[in-house]
């Protein structure tokens, strides 16, 4: 163990280097200039880290920054979490019992651990990783330990420009989310009544009926919900009941559903998401979510990846990725119905940076409402807007803890909830030991995609 005096922005501190005690070949560290530290990982079995500490102001905010230049022996094998920066928050060491809500955190200093986010760029043969994130100081914590850790792939990392700054506490980033619930049953009754009267219900007429239901719901929402940020409707509402849904597949932007969303998005300055049968420029049909932003512009399209047999036998073509959309309040992803029974789907959306999931579907069963959808929110640590087409099951909003925070069963009704996308939900233990961790970050920062991608579906049978 090597101890070197150094300095962080807010306080004089001590830097200490450690190598994992069970490693066959030890990692090494040295100070190569004032405030510049080198970490060398010699082999697959090595792990080493530099650590230092700083005082913080309870109740305030702290911005952590650092630049790390990483030279690796084999760049193709280097993955996102081979080199990381994390912070460990400590309570005052005064012996007080600060156990909260039975989470097991009590007598002792360690309270919480967080990874610091980073951005990468290439500089010749090196990777330059810039860490930069601002946190709210948790509870009564008055100090923080900062660790830079390298592991498992041979590398030499140079750590410089480490800054720990007391700043204002981060403000909430509240988003007013609404899920509309039109024509759960009523839409089909209207169509049936017109057919009984002898009226020929073409695809275009059916779409007009259903879009009328959606517009009725939009009118209800804007009459009662002040300043919504985003509204979601359920799967393929506009073609429900059409004799041949593919015949009324529409261009996005430009089709009837788009024009309705554009009208209300611009009038009320609200992001509106709908799920439609889309016909693309090549003539192929997709099951598609689109988001129309507050200015009436297309923010993004998601095409359903996991199709049902009924869909592909109809001629629907699947999407081939999980894009996310940058809106004015944050980054949003989407999945459609059957997609969300595959846990990989929401993890891919999360891996692409989504902070909120749009999830329209045609229908499901009660146990899916009770277990599957909350589990997906917990899996990825992101909230979900659920727009259902069945009146006996809820449309609503699930927070990142997997709790339904709003529901509606009403035709042309709505569910509304204000979500704080800056709210860092913590859970006891996870991988951090006897302390609190943030699932939203941990499930990404400690995942092993390089292992998962070795799966060969050709050799695997159920």
Which ranges hold each PLM region?
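Extracellular and organelle-lumenal recognition/adhesion modules and their flexible linkers in secreted
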Residues: 7-170
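C-terminal beta-strand edge segments of enzyme domains
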Residues: 125-130, 200, 324, 388-462
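Beta-strand-turn-beta hairpins that frame and shape the catalytic cleft
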Residues: 168-179, 186-188, 324-333, 356
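Cys-nucleophile CN-hydrolase/nitrilase-fold catalytic domain and related Cys-dependent amidase chemistry
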Residues: 208, 212, 216-294, 365-382
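Active-site catalytic loop in hydrolytic enzyme cores
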Residues: 280-355, 361, 371, 375, ...
């Amino acid at each position: 163990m090597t101890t070197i005096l150094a300095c962080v922005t807010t306080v004089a501190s001590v830097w200490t280097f450690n190598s994992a005690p069970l490693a066959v070949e030890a990692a090494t560290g040295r100070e190569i200039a004032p405030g510049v530290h080198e970490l060398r990982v010699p082999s697959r079995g090595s792990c080493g880290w530099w650590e230092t500490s700083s005082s913080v102001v309870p109740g305030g905010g702290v911005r952590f920054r650092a630049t790390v230049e990483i030279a690796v022996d084999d760049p193709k094998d280097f993955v996102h979490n081979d080199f990381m920066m994390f912070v460990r928050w400590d309570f005052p060491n005064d012996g007080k019992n600060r156990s909260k809500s039975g989470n097991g955190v009590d007598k002792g200093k360690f309270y919480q651990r967080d990874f610091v986010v980073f951005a990468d760029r290439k500089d010749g043969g090196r990777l330059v990783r810039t860490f930069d994130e601002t946190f709210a100081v948790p509870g009564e914590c008055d100090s923080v330990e900062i660790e830079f850790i390298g592991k498992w792939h041979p590398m030499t990392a140079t750590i410089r420009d480490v800054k720990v700054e007391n700043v204002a506490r981060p403000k909430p980033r509240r988003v007013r989310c609404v899920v509309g619930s039109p024509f759960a049953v009523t839409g089909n009754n209207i169509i049936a009544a017109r057919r009984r009267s002898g009226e020929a219900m073409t695809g275009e007429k059916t779409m007009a009926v259903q879009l009328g239901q959606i517009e009725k719901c939009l009118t209800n929402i804007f009459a009662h919900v002040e300043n919504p940020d985003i509204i979601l409707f359920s799967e393929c509402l506009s073609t429900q009941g059409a004799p041949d849904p593919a015949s009324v597949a529409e261009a996005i932007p430009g089709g009837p559903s788009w024009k309705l969303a554009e009208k209300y998005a611009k009038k009320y300055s609200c992001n509106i998401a709908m799920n439609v049968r889309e016909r693309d420029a090549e003539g192929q049909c997709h099951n598609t979510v689109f988001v129309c932003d507050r200015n009436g512009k297309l923010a993004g399209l998601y095409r359903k990846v996991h199709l049902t047999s009924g869909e592909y036998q109809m001629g629907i073509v699947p999407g081939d990725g999980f894009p996310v959309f940058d809106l004015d309040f944050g980054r949003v992803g989407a999945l459609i119905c059957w997609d969300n029974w595959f846990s990989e789907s929401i993890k891919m959306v999360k891996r692409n940076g989504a902070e909120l999931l749009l999830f329209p579907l045609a229908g499901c069963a009660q146990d899916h409402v009770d277990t599957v959808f909350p589990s997906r929110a917990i899996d990825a640590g992101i909230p979900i807007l659920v727009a259902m087409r069945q009146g006996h099951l809820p449309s609503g909003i699930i927070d990142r803890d997997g709790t339904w925070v709003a529901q509606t069963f009403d035709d042309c009704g709505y569910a509304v909830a204000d979500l704080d996308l800056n709210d860092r939900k913590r859970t006891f233990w996870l991988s951090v030991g006897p302390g609190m961790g943030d699932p939203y970050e941990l499930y990404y920062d400690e995942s092993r995609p390089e292992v998962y991608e070795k799966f060969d579906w050709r050799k695997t049978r159920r």
